[in-house]
Curated annotation (Swiss-Prot):
GO function terms (MF aspect): glycerol-3-phosphate dehydrogenase (quinone) activity
Enzyme Commission no: 1.1.5.3
UniProt-listed GO biological process terms: glycerol catabolic process
Family: Belongs to the anaerobic G-3-P dehydrogenase subunit B family.
Quaternary structure (record): Composed of a catalytic GlpA/B dimer and of membrane bound GlpC.
Source organism: Haemophilus influenzae (strain ATCC 51907 / DSM 11121 / KW20 / Rd)
Principal EC category: oxidoreductase
Protein name per its UniProtKB record: Anaerobic glycerol-3-phosphate dehydrogenase subunit B
Keywords linked to the UniProt accession: Flavoprotein, FMN, Oxidoreductase
Xref: PANTHER family: ANAEROBIC GLYCEROL-3-PHOSPHATE DEHYDROGENASE SUBUNIT B, FUMARATE REDUCTASE
Length: 432
């Protein structure tokens, strides 16, 4: 099978890159191994939330994105943002904002500065873009609603309203609020309660989206809110989009917000579903449940790849994009004596002091400190071309968290790296 572009990985980075290419006339295939990290994400995207700490002290929170992305080059020269340059990073981030609006992802935020989003535990976390159904505040501004009811679902343990309510008022932006907590009694979920493994956000949303007892649910929310102006709910209402939440908001006439629960995350799944629908509607091909095994090279180019399900058929393309993610998605593999990228056997880099063949450099002494192994990934140049055996391959690009040289957990930049590198690589391929 021959394509213009073959993309390995169907997560945020792979889908974003594929959509940008399909929109400009390229014929793309995505080899998708299974659920991506986006299915377990909060739904909020971070461009850069914290600056690195050289002494394992407190990481400084980022508010002004342009200023800090520019400063990042001095501290982490191998970070993808440092390689691309601040101007291109911000330009590609703005391109993604336009794409998100086009796809009706219902995201709020901008590259001007970060905002704070409320987490499922009641703390505040910096973010670049968040679903407009998630409660957010800008800087130290007070939350606009004074009376808040945090409502869980009886028997649902992946969202704890009492804990959230107690932690929420500790934040200066919510110290003026009166916060109560309670539980919704939804009889339609009784069947799910019999098996705790099935009582998850996805199962709940699938059961409720048929709106068989919509009026009863509206009545239960109004009564449980007890006169509150705003209601925080677990993200269990509406699997593919926010239409169900919008209908509830209109019917209750309350300021309803939803918060991410323990994974799987409905907020992240909605985004992946909408991105995939867009890609396929543009004529792209997604091969699900398959994984790339190895590649054949000709000089400094990739000629073809082989996959697990298509053993006897090579996938050839003019360009290849590695969007396979990090350890979670098996884009990187760790053995006792080495960390490696399994498909192309690309060169691996990390932060200063990390050696992918020296296990003693993989971890920090303190568990809570940033761990060097989390910065492992493939080496790239300013065009996001992948390095192998010291040479850059001219038709192989890497996007997202398979790239090394930065710790996405420490810096809060995983989503930003995914979409920025994805759109930058799309531009590189289209310019050929």
């Amino acid at each position: 099978m021959n394509f213009d572009v073959a993309i390995i990985g169907g997560g945020l980075a792979g889908l974003t890159c594929a959509i940008a290419l399909q929109q400009r006339g390229k014929r793309c295939v995505i080899i998708n191994n299974g659920q991506a990290a986006i299915d377990f994400a909060s739904g909020s995207l971070d461009l850069l939330s914290r600056m690195p700490s050289t002494t394992y002290g407190e990481n400084r929170a980022v508010e002004n994105l342009k200023e800090n992305i520019t400063a990042l080059r001095n501290e982490l020269p191998a970070h993808p943002y440092s390689l691309l340059g601040a101007e291109k990073v911000l330009a590609k981030a703005q391109d993604f904002e336009r794409l998100a609006n086009e796809l009706h992802l219902d995201l709020i935020g901008s590259t001007e500065k970060n905002h704070w989003r409320v987490t499922g535990l009641g703390s505040l976390r910096g973010a670049w873009l968040s679903p407009n159904s998630v409660p957010t505040v800008q800087g130290n501004e007070p939350f606009p609603h004074k009376r808040i009811a945090v409502l869980g679902i009886e028997g649902y343990h992946d969202f704890q309203p009492q804990l959230l309510a107690a932690n929420l008022v500790l934040n200066p932006q919510f110290e003026h609020c009166e916060v109560t907590s309670g539980f919704l009694n939804i009889p339609q979920l009784d069947e799910l309660r019999k098996n705790a493994r099935e009582f998850r956000s996805v199962n709940i949303s699938q059961l409720l989206e048929h709106k068989l007892a919509f009026k009863d649910l509206v009545k239960e929310i109004i009564e449980s809110a007890q006169g509150a102006e705003a209601v925080f709910l677990p993200a269990c209402f509406g699997l593919e989009n926010q239409e169900f939440m919008t209908a509830l908001r209109d019917a209750t006439k309350l300021a309803l917000f939803e918060l991410p629960t323990l994974p799987p995350s409905l907020l992240g799944m909605r985004q992946r579903i909408q991105l995939r629908h867009k890609f396929e509607s543009l004529g792209g091909l997604m091969i699900n449940g398959d994984s790339a095994l190895n590649a054949t090279f000709e000089g400094n180019q990739v000629r073809c790849i082989n996959t697990r399900l298509l053993e006897d058929e090579e996938i050839t393309a003019d360009n290849f994009v590695l969007a396979s993610g990090s350890f979670f998605s098996k884009g990187l593999i760790s053995e006792f004596d080495k960390i490696y990228e399994p498909v192309f056997e690309s060169d691996i880099i990390g932060v200063e002091g990390f050696n992918n063949k020296d296990r003693f450099t993989w971890t920090a002494h303190r568990f809570a400190h940033p761990q060097p192994y989390q910065s492992a990934g493939v080496a790239i140049n300013a065009q996001c071309q992948v390095k192998k055996c010291g040479q850059f391959l001219t038709n192989l690009y890497a996007v997202g968290n398979v790239i090394g040289g930065f710790n996405a957990l420490e810096l809060g930049c995983g989503s930003g790296v995914a979409v920025v590198t994805a759109l930058a690589v799309a531009d590189e391929i289209l310019a050929k």
